[in-house]
Amino acid sequence: ALETLLELERNPRPWRKGLYVDPSNYAQIGGWTFDKEGHRTQLNFDTCYPMVKGDPGEATPVRIGRAREDTCPHCGCQMVDILVLDGRDERLKFLGLAGILTATCCPNCVGFLKGPAFNSFTLDGGVEVFPSELFDGAGKMDCYVRPEDYRSLTENPFVLGGAPMPLFYGAACDDVNTVGGFANWVQDWEYTACPHCGKPMKYLAQIQWDTLMDGTEGTLYIEFCPDCQIVSMQHQQT
């Protein structure tokens, strides 16, 4: 497949003019891409773990929805560490993270941004949230996340499952939260370019909003650049 797509990239056929994107884009649905020299880059991991409902107070190396004190500049909602992942756990060794990855966003605005939400992370748990812009260019928007919604989000029972699932488990189900493997893209697959180095980010996890808060829709996809230690979070829904 790589040889064929590289040939089409270097020598476009006449029918290319009728396509919206280059044929090479379709490699991404298989979880990989390549550069102009033909060097292949994997965009996902070949191991998939589910997030399952655990017992109250159960220890877990992956936490969804940890409360924060700071607030969103757009809507005033409390920010949230939507994913906190300790790569030192034996189950997560496949990620190649020698510490903690934290993904931070506004649970109200992350679906209304122009592009993904970004933050940098340090392996000791530190976070720096990048500035963001609302999709319509407005400076402010209403907050639709009620206090009881935020409490539901940050007190959810999910913990990392004890055993891996099939590689395409996350892609085949629209009601599961997963780490690794393939995503169930609501729309088209979308691998974000790292804002620092420009390389495509690697898919890390997906979170279904309706598993955390009643009355919500869509999926949050979390990707990261291991070299630059930057995380992206993007929302899709029907």
What would you call each of these model-derived segments?
Residues A1-T238:
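Preference for intrinsically disordered or flexible, low-complexity segments
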